[in-house]
Amino acid sequence: MTGPSADVSVRVAWADDAPAIADLQLRAWREMYAGVVPADALPTDVEAAAAAWHALLARPPEARYRVLVALERNRVVGFAITAPAPDPDCDPVADAELAELTVDPDERGKGHGSRLLQAAVDTVQADRFTRVVLWAIATDDELRGFLADAGWAPDQAHRELDLDGTGVTLVKQVRLHTAIG
């Protein structure tokens, strides 16, 4: 006898998902950037974030820009963003970027990240990309380990993001990549 299985899935995000994505993103960022970025440098206005998400989902910036959501019992528990890779050393026809892969901190370890990652790879593969890149915080060993287990590796690219435009709040990132198809 088996127990009941959770109702879990991944689908393309709808504009109506904006409030849930915004709330999840801001909560996840507080955890992800703790000790890396001063708390007051992070956005806190969920309504403003929801409005920005709604606009983005209603009118994506380009045809191959996708937002996917992981659901558990029709509740958003994670999201991923895919798009052509914007880096100057990437080929926007062949290289996709996984711009964000975020799972609700309270829902980690339940397979949502793996489902999102697979759906994101399937999506960019359907868009005929042959490689995917992702920028990770250099100290985010959890994400880097998760991606390494899935076959991703650093490609030697690195950068520092200036989050507040003053040069005070810099976040070091490394780029990971994987070949697909």
Please annotate each region the language model reported.
Residues 3, 12-16, 23-106, 114-119, ...:
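Acetyl-CoA-dependent GNAT
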